[in-house]
Every structure is written in structure tokens, then in C-alpha cells.
Amino acid sequence: MTKTLAEQPGEGAAPVSPSPSRRALLHGAAGLGALAAGAAVAGPGLAFAAPAGLPLPPATPGITPFKIAVPQSALTDLKRRLGATRWPERETVEDWSQGVPLAKLQGLVEYWRTRYDWRRAEATLNRFPNYRTQLDGLGIHFLHARSKHENALPILLTHGWPGSVIEFLKLIPLLTDPTAHGGKAEDAFHVILPSLPGFGFSDKPTQKGWNMARIAKAWAELMQRLGYTHWVAQGGDWGAGVTTALAHLQPAGLAGIHLNFPLVFPEKLPTTDLSPEEQRALAQAQAFNTHGSGYFLLQTTRPQTVGYALADSPSGQAAWIYEKFQGWTDNKGDPESALSQDEMLDNISLYWLTDTAASSARIYWENAGSNFSGGKLDLPVGVSVFPRELFRAPKRWAEQTYSKLIYWNEPDRGGHFAAFEQPALFAHELRECFRQLRAK
């Protein structure tokens, strides 16, 4: 996910110029993010399968426990589809510049078909308390893991695209039980981890309007409903946008936020006397707009069209996400050096089994033209900039946007999926950032 590296382009947007303006830079980076076969719907001489997806229980304003249980028929159908994949010819280059190499995807798909075990992932998810509740008319899924330690600080974590709650599963025990993982009891957190609307086990919006600001309002209501009166929030990718919108909303009890994808730019881009960090940031933005924004433009302008292809082909869905694990993680050339095949397939399988290719892509369309940073922010903000992040904002730019920048660090490893790639390091960043915001 996340937004563009400036304002998002509309239809017919002009190509990025060699000397990018702030508008052009900002404009390419947001993503700098069947089940039971249904009854056929008869048409004139045609029959179409009903939309796939898990049958989710209706949500109510109450907090309802939820257990994940994918029907076996969905897993059988997945393996059948994987075995029937129609492959294109191989790429004409020896790298990833044309997309996922054929041999790499075939290897991942064969592992998915013959060796991968969704039930293991399902059991891991169910190890934590899962719930659903209705927020602004939509059923929202969330994990809520409370710490055993007194005075633990509630933290609201928000994922992005193509991520999910699965990104944070290794992080949860590090936050809730720090004494078991080299930390101190006073560093404990209660973890609240929702699935964005249209993602995972949350409902899919049936009407437009679910942009970052609306999601932020729903998250504020969730924290109030859970009874928290002093809490913090964290996000990367689209989660950074939602968390920033939450900070601008300043709901009761929100003490501060942490971001690992601060998409901030100065009001006026300087043309001379750029620091090395500023030169690097501008080069990153231009490179993304030129070489890495194809998915972003598609999902910003035609999420429904993309959805038809991905909803019908698990191999296509895998390629769409696997490519991002290669390009956006701190790896040695192959994504498997940053994340295991099982870890990547846990996330890919969640998208496939919940049939959320189109609904998750719509977050780009919903936020076209939005200001990702939302302007000046007065709430306390902490930032961790990981070395293989899509865009590494200079501290000077962050200071111009965040008047209360309470924490800034640039760890030595990790990428866009930092919590997934480096959970222990990510936990350390959160402990350090929020230590000063804990209730006395």
C-alpha cells in the first residue's frame, strides 16, 4: 500500500517528468499495499459462480468472539485451481524487472499446492482472542491480546496493503509478555489489531466512502468501546495513513502515535543545498514513480478490474503479492531471505480464502487525491525509518510536519514489512518510542 508519493493521480495523469515537482513526487506512492462454491446465478445462456468468500457471522455493536474456520471445500478448491494454472511464457530478462520470474512463481505455487498447511496458520490466528464488532455499520474483525502485566499500555496496530493482521502475529507476544522475551514488565502492551474494511475477516464495504478518515473514526470508536482511556497507535503503509488520520482526529485517550512509513514532504521542495538524505529521498520517490507504481495506478483507478483476475486465479493473487515481498523487504535478492514461504503464503492465503483482492484494492481508489500526512500534526509522534523502506523521509522533513517529534530512529535492518521481517527489532522500537507516554 500506502498512498502515492504525493497527491494521487487521476485518470489521464501526465507522466512523471525527469525533474519531479512535489506534486509529481507525491503522486505515485500510496502503495509505497472460494470458499464454499456458491449457487450459480443464471444469466442469458450463462451461469456464473456466486462471489466467493468466507460466510462471516453478522456483526453487532457488541463485542462478539470469533473463531476462524475455513471450510475444507475452500482448501480443496484452492488446490484444484493451483493445479490447473495456465502459465505464460517465461520473462525475457534474468531478474525481476518484468515482474515475478516464471520459475520463482511456479516453485511457490507448487509448494502452496503440495506442502503448505493453512490449518497451521489458522491455529496460530485462533491462538489469540479474535472478535467481530459493528463499527459505522460495518462488521470489523480484530484481535485483542491483553497483557498479564499491570499498567500495560494499550496499542492499536493497523496494517496496510498487501499486508494483514498476519504481519503482526510474531510481534504480539513480544509486546504483551516482554519479560518472556528479554524486556521489562513496565514495557508491556495490550494489543488491539483490527483488519481494515475489505481485508481479511472484516466486512467488505458495499458503498463508497471508506477512506482513511472514516476508518480512523471507526478505530476511535473501537477503542472507546473496549474501555481504553489512555492508549497509543501505530501503523505502516495504509496503516500509517489511518494512524495519522487518527492523530488529527485526536480522540479521547490517544496519547501519541508511531509510524514506520512517514510519507512527508516539505511545503516547498528546495532546488539547491539539498542534504544527502534529501537527495536520497527525492531519488527514491522518482524511482518509485518511474519503476514501481504500476500496481498503484491500477488499484487507484481500476480496483474492480484488477479484482476479476485475482479473484479467479490463486496463482495470480500469489504473484501480485509475492512481487511486493521481493521488492519491499530487506532481502538478499529473493524474498525467501527475508520471509519464509510459509509466512508469505499465510498472508497470500488469507487474501485468497477471504476473496478480498478487489475489496482491499479499493482502499487506493477511496483515497485518491487524499493528503496522506494530513498536514501539520501536534500530537506526539515517533518514527522508525527502516533501511529498505520504499521511501525514507529525512528527519528535517518530518520535523516540519510533526511539531512534537518525540522519537526518531533509523534501524540497521528491515524493510516495508518491518514487523513481519524483524519482530524483535520492531518491538524494541515501540518500547523505546512509547516509554515516555505511559501513564504515570
From Swiss-Prot:
Domain of life of the organism encoding this protein: Bacteria
Reaction catalysed by this enzyme: an epoxide + H2O = an ethanediol
Disordered: region residues: 1-21
Protein keywords: Aromatic hydrocarbons catabolism, Hydrolase, Signal
Cytoplasm keyword on record: no
Enzyme Commission code(s) on record: 3.3.2.10
Signal peptide annotation: 1-49
Pfam families recorded: EHN
Gene Ontology BP, a term: catabolic process
PTM notes: Predicted to be exported by the Tat system. The position of the signal peptide cleavage has not been experimentally proven.
PROSITE patterns: TAT
A GO molecular-function descriptor: epoxide hydrolase activity
InterPro entries reported in the protein's UniProt record: AB_hydrolase_fold (IPR029058), Epox_hydrolase-like (IPR000639), Epoxide_hydro_N (IPR010497), Epoxide_hydrolase (IPR016292), TAT_signal (IPR006311)
UniProt family annotation: Belongs to the peptidase S33 family.
The protein's name in its UniProt record: Putative epoxide hydrolase
Natural source organism: Stigmatella aurantiaca (strain DW4/3-1)
